Amino acid sequence: GMNPEKDFLQFDCALSYGLVEYLRILEMLNEHGWSSRRCIPHGGHQMSLNIAAGLALHGNESYPGVFQPFGGFADNYAVEDGYVRLPDIPGIGFEAKSDLYSLLSSIGK
């Protein structure tokens, strides 16, 4: 079985659950002995990175360059030695991903 002291769990907070449901999942897991630091957001994108940082989780799945324009992180923010910085802009940081921002802007017109 799964061990809350050894195993890590991944939930796709952006595409399936959203932040509110992700928080509910963390609360339920906590009631069953799991630390939120054993949960790594699935997705490898800017929203998961922000959720991991905002909730002080143990990490974030990362695969830059895949599933573009949604995957990966803000432009000019490279993964170095296993770390990536958050963009210095308000919000999730989608505006700092030029290809994604262009796509979403064109849909909204």
Question: What is each of the regions a protein language model found here?
Answer:
Residues 1-83:
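Shared catalytic-loop signature of beta/alpha-barrel
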Residues 67-109:
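C-terminal extensions of enzymes
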